[in-house]
Amino acid sequence: MATNSTDLPPQPVVAPELAPSLRNRADQSNSPYIQGQINSPVAWQLLDDEAVERAKRENKLIFLNIGFKACHYCRLTAIDSFSHPECASLLNEAFVPVIVDREERPDLDTIYMNYVQAVNGAGGWPLNLFLTPELEPVFGGTYWPGPGAHTKTGPEEEEGVDFLAILKNLRKVWQEQEPRCRQEAKEVLSKLREFAAEGTLGTRSTVQMSKIGLTSSSTAPVASAVSTENPGAGKTAADVSSELDLDQLEEAYSHIAGTFDPVYGGGLRDHVGGCGFARYSITPDWSIPHFEKLTSDNALLLGLYLDAWLISNGDKDGELYDVVVELADYFSSPPMRLPGGGFASSEAADSYYRRGDTDVREGAFHLWTRKEFDAVIGDEHEATIAATYWNILEHGNVEPDQDPNDEFMNQNIPRVLKEQSEIGKQFGISGEEVARVIASAKAKLKAHRGRERVRPELDDKIISGWNGLVISALARTGAALAVKDAAKSAQYLGAAIQSAEFVRAQLWDEKEKTLYKVFRGTRGSTKAFAEDYAYLIEGLIDLYEATGEENCIAFADELQQTQIKLFYDASAPTTSASPNPLPAHSSCGAFFATTEDAKHTILRLKDGMDTAFPSNNAVSVSNLFRLGVALATETYTALARETLNAFEAEILQYPWLFPGLLSGVVSSRLGGRTYIVVRDPSGADDETVRKVFIKLYGEARGGLRNLIIVKGPDDLVVRRNPALAELVATGKPGAYVVEEGKFRPCAKEDVEY
């Protein structure tokens, strides 16, 4: 019998499914920065599908915090804001709070930093943003003081709105003006996409900008930007840049040579312990740093100071040599060199002043009162000389107007203002005696610091690309010292080799042919970005040239093939349905920073400009040219030229912003001299071979020469290069030069140093 639906028994009313309450997921990350928030009252989420889907389902703004463990203001934000009960409660109730380690996701850091810099005129860390559930930026900034906190980020900063007020305002705006927020966020994203057109405006024509005059025109803005009062600094706080024009022209050296003394003599350098350079100075005279030390910065500085030393004289004396050895020792020793061979990421800005202290302070490990300084040195006369040398003053050497938060009252940051010869005249003693006193004082201060103080906390993440930077710097340094200091050379080359072996074993998936980004006890899930491939390939090529180890260039070749496959812009333009839509004219060569299927990434960028890091495209161009020569692979050379073409429009308009790519322009236009060293199987290399090594390792890297080392007929370089195979089969051990595709024995003028 048919039954009317109204006759059915009443159905139970099912309540809409409630989303589970937020819980802090920081313990699911292996990042030291994120793990630092495990006990935070904020219910931190990781940037994954779960967090993004929750934001969409609950229609909430995402609060995105991007930072890193060594960062001073990241720690203050965690204390002043994230630990504040009302701030934490509001974050959990009205937003989906997401935390990201910038060193694990540099792609996100770059995208959202571009936004904050465009809107606010400046950036920094922590990077704090409010995003739509589609990850489009609505509002952002850097450090915001917590409720009741009065911390300033600089002497001229005025007290502004605190973090709690910002949270309340953003909650209200989203509740009352969501359509407007979404529309403005889409407009902002459109503008960011236009900005991201870098590297998509070039043509596939012959490289028109390969006129060498471009390199000289690029030095004029560099020269005008260098302050004569504070060399190396511009109009604002000083930032260490390693991509100045050392690789381009000797002329540029005159513009930047004045930078070296104030940087290595300033407050950024650890004068007592030789433990690297702090990341940047908050004053234009390089006197007051933020004390975090990043592996990437110090690796790049090692390469820069190595070039400066080689250009100046290459002798085993002088401050430049001391800086080179200090930095190389810093990397090839604990704690930066970790068990197993990888290099740690950073040392924190904040530390305990003495063992047993309960609160950390910025720079505490590196600061000295005059009273403690004198007591440690002991001898009054020697203490006076050392204090004069390092500018250690009775009431501290940080001016009150440069210390808005009173962190450095009566404290001294060692820095050198006078030459030792000048101090010798002041005290009526010889320069040699001054040097002896300084060395003695340094040893006493270092020993005291090691006993009484706690070294800043280490971020022991091993980053594949940053390890590539260190491998490159140590390989070049070890090679340069091969004749001058064999023991140091072996130490540095050994550390570089061990790191390369570690990265291959732990971060390279041989089956997938994929490089991963981070190792910390175990391999992380994040795959490497284009910059990681570029930096690691460069390090391996440098290590091959320094050691002749075939597995280095073989691994570099594997990585290069994968980088091209994953990141090179060789496909047709993607459609608007793609997760990462691109401008219609985007398919014109060069490397994207991310893969096409990168998740939770609103833009796919190509970087050509050098920043605090060398651009991945500039390094990749150099790698392609070098591998193209060593492995006789024309495809690599063609892709290098095509990558240069992709940035043609920008380079022609602003050449001084692209020093790394300009080096590629020079290589493309002039080529380079290639040296072939065929080793004697008996190990009895002749004098010419020795002179080739001395010449090439004793020169600053200029991108205009290549070195191929042959140990036997089965070498990869021989198998890939028929002409080289013929030379090995018919020639004798020794040194050769390639000219117009032909080999000839090195003449005297080829190896003159």
Give the residues covered by each predicted segment.
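Replace the tail clause
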Residues: 2-469, 473, 479, 574-582, ...
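Extended hydrophobic/aromatic segments used for targeting, binding, or gating
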Residues: 85-89, 97, 270-299, 472-547
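Hydrophobic, structured segments
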Residues: 243, 247, 436, 482-486, ...
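Catalytic-loop motifs flanking and including active-site residues across diverse enzymes
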Residues: 297-301, 466-467, 532-535, 616-619
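Inward-facing hydrophobic residues that define packing positions of alpha-helical scaffold repeats
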Residues: 305, 324, 328, 474, ...
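Inter-helical turn/loop segments and adjacent helix faces that build the functional surface
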Residues: 308-319, 477-489, 543-550, 627-637
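Conserved positions within tetratricopeptide repeat
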Residues: 318-325, 387, 490-493, 497, ...
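Long, polar/charge-rich, low-hydrophobicity segments
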Residues: 333-339, 505-534, 541-722
